[in-house]
């Protein structure tokens, strides 16, 4: 597995509170805007979808691709970020 980004490290270091969806690793401005347009404006809303999908990597990656057009790397970065956050805080 590749090393995690600073964005990933910053996100998983603390409770997410009201962080923007763009605070998630793998989600930049373009994907963030697409997610916001579909009602996923906060990181915790994406976390909710992640949990509804039972933290299943394949289902979450597919959902992210279908919802905002995330590529394979972006999908993996976002999944890993949420998985590690859940391991620390849930």
From Swiss-Prot:
Pfam families with a match to the protein in the record: SAM_BAF
GO molecular function annotations of the record: DNA binding
Keyword Repeat on entry: no
Main localization of the protein described in the UniProt heading: nucleus
Keywords: Chromosome, Cytoplasm, DNA-binding, Nucleus, Phosphoprotein
Subcellular location: Nucleus; Chromosome; Nucleus envelope; Cytoplasm
One Gene Ontology term from the biological process aspect of the record: chromosome organization
Gene3D superfamilies assigned to the protein according to its UniProt record, in alphabetical order: Barrier-to-autointegration factor, BAF
Positions where Phosphoserine occurs in the chain: 2-3, 5
InterPro entries, A to Z: BAF, BAF_prot, BAF_sf
KW Nucleus (keyword) present: yes
Modified residue annotations for Phosphothreonine: 4
Any Gene Ontology CC annotation: condensed chromosome
Functional summary from the UniProt entry: Non-specific DNA-binding protein that plays key roles in mitotic nuclear reassembly, chromatin organization, DNA damage response, gene expression and intrinsic immunity against foreign DNA. Contains two non-specific double-stranded DNA (dsDNA)-binding sites which promote DNA cross-bridging. Plays a key role in nuclear membrane reformation at the end of mitosis by driving formation of a single nucleus in a spindle-independent manner.
Complex formation: Homodimer.
Protein family per UniProt: Belongs to the BAF family.
PANTHER family: BARRIER TO AUTOINTEGRATION FACTOR 2 (PTHR47507), BARRIER-TO-AUTOINTEGRATION FACTOR (PTHR47507:SF5)
Entry domain remark: Has a helix-hairpin-helix (HhH) structural motif conserved among proteins that bind non-specifically to DNA.
Official protein name in the record: Barrier-to-autointegration factor
